[in-house]
């Protein structure tokens, strides 16, 4: 596994600037008083997709080989990660498939489709959708983009610390 370093964070931060908006830090009087520290909030809901998840997805795609990009990618999500992957894939011209539980709110399904992803509704809960997405990835030779467990996802997500 790759090592997380300040340099890797900085490289990820630079790369995701291509697909994200800068967001300001907002001082929180409430949380500062509750913790005895100066606490600032970073409104990542102001990103194009409404969440920080686009950072990890975009960076992950940037690290994929051209061959892997040609084959496409797949993920499972019921919301923000789905939209982040769809948005990032569209920016790179990569075919994205998103497996979402059948219980996913229609607005999330439609926004994901709106970014160009193929959406497959499968299973009642995330775990079922994820299992199916991993099965399809293996069968079709697609890159599976996990919402949490990859260094490529965590580096740009933690980029918030740098900014």
Give, region by region, the residue ranges found by the protein language model.
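Generic transmembrane alpha-helix signature in multi-pass membrane proteins
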Residues: 61, 84-86, 163
